[in-house]
Amino acid sequence: DSSTSRGLGDVYKRQVCTGMPGSLPVLNKQVVEYALAVGLAANCRINQYCKFDRKNYFYPDNPQNYQISQLYLPVCRDGWVDIETESGLKKRVGIHEIHMEEDAGKLIHDEWEDCSLVDYNRSGVPLIEIVSEPDMRSAEEVIAYLEKLRLIIQYLGASDCKLQEGSMRADVNLSVREAGAPEFGTRTEMKNLNSFKAIARAIEGERRRQIELLEEGRQVIQETRRWDDNKESSKAMRSKEDAQDYRYFPDPDLVPVVISDEWIARVKARQPELRTEKIARYKEEYGLPEYDARLLTSSKHMADIFEETTRLSGRPKEASNWLMVEAMRLMKEQEMEPEDMEFSTSHLAALIRMVENNIINRTVAKTVFEEIFRHDADPEAYVEENGLKVVKDEGALRDTVKAVMAANPQSVEDYRNGREKAMGFLVGQTMKAMKGKADPSMVNQLVRELLAGGDV
């Protein structure tokens, strides 16, 4: 029922979301469709008869003292996704189930040392929870799996999946065992993980902690632990319960959901192109290499920018190069995610046309692109205002080349003695003198002509 989970103060809190007396829950149809879409994309079996249960527990972020969830008949079961790690390992990770539930509030622990705050803005917000099989054996595999799920969900439009904002969360259950041991060890659950890097560090930290306990002859306690990424350590929050401790029973206020074949067919027909299909199309339709196609589709937002820029400019390889080289460089410098890019695709398309039509050269274009990237500048207006158009006045270029050659007689002599690299130096100095605005082909031609003719 809550319209959003992001706000200051309890601005989005509703009576039904916090279980106020007299309020009754209402099923959000959209979350059912999102759950079906994700389940289909993750190769799940759809439960065409599913229902809701109450998970009973007391905690400050849960004013109802129960959470509406699905234990016995979740919407999806028995799925899988294929992953590939950065080191090249390929494997299939099973999905035990996908269920729908309502979100709890958010506890804020780091504002004051002696108390915690409770934010109920996200209480009652519908979410889907993906329960994974214990198939992953390293932090690298976990990150590859989460990245795969994030891309699926983003491409489906079910969520923007921003960990730092809480629209995607991951609780990591981890245990260790001796090599060859048939049974899993005692697991702990790690919370407060708001980035993939934090997840990887938490996994490594908890792995070391559990191994140290066992090597010292102590037991691992089944508990929920809170990860502190600044200290790179965790502390116990509460004991970890099993399902029977929550005293699940069917929610009496919500009727079962019957999912017809026709409903599934409608959801399937609306499924958008996912990353795997997009990679194949980029290679076939645009002639992009595998690496380029993978990088451009590693974010739905990046793929959208690429496709729209290509549509406007008609130059897929140029659009790809600007995004893969310059945009990636600037994102790294500013510690940005692809989803943070906000410039207009029409501006990037205009820049591509300006380079193609030799209105500006590539050196200047890089400067202009930075303005587009940082401030969404109109490239045509920016070039005009700053006098950055390519200088094609042969007389002015010839005079500049002569001045550069006169200032560098040793390079002129080196070239005439057979050292071809000296010409590159003179071209570079000319471009520098022209502040990058000269036509490189004209500069090359004039330098070669003047060196050959001895007219310096």
Descriptions of predicted regions:
Residues 142, 293, 319, 365, ...:
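Small-residue helix-packing motif on alpha-helices
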Residues 38, 206, 309, 322, ...:
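Amphipathic alpha-helical segments in well-ordered regions
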Residues 312-313, 319, 327-342, 350-355, ...:
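M16/insulysin-pitrilysin zinc metalloprotease superfamily fold
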Residues 5-273, 290, 311-315, 328:
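Basic, nucleic-acid-interacting segments
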Residues 120-125, 163-170, 179-182, 390-456:
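C-terminal non-catalytic interaction appendages of large macromolecular assemblies
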Residues 338-349, 353, 359-432:
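Strongly charged, low-complexity linkers/loops
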Residues 1-2:
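Short, well-ordered junction/capping motifs at the entry into regular secondary structure
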Residues 166-178, 283-305, 316-333, 346-348, ...:
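Core structural elements
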